[in-house]
Amino acid sequence: INGCLVGSEMCIRDSYHTDVLMYIGTNVVGICFDVIKEKYRELVLESVKEHHEVIELSSPQLLDFCGNCLEVENNCGDLFLVMSTRAYKSYTGSQIQQIKKNYKGVIHRDLPVIERYGGGSARCMLAELF
């Protein structure tokens, strides 16, 4: 497993893919603190909220790939958040409002094959193109 190092100790509990636990955008970060070792949660929270609005993701949302989003920018400079429909449906209404406050829009598509057989979601798929 890969994770952040604090001293010489990993701060992320076992997870098959660390890129599903969080995404970081220009102004917002979506993160699942449940999978971060308890003694490091406050440190990570303070670090990310210094420059970003924080959307806390639950463990079930993590399994629905809510942390596997990607911020993209169009040629007019507008920011969008790309995710799977599975992730979109897993966000709460208040979380969607937080997202829409920070982005021009949300782009989501159904990605069942990527999510079931690829082990990732929208960000994993799109990051292969960069």
Annotate the PLM regions.
Residues 40-90:
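Glycine/small-residue-rich hydrophobic helix-like segments
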Residues 1, 17, 124:
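Histidine-centered active-site/metal-ligand motif
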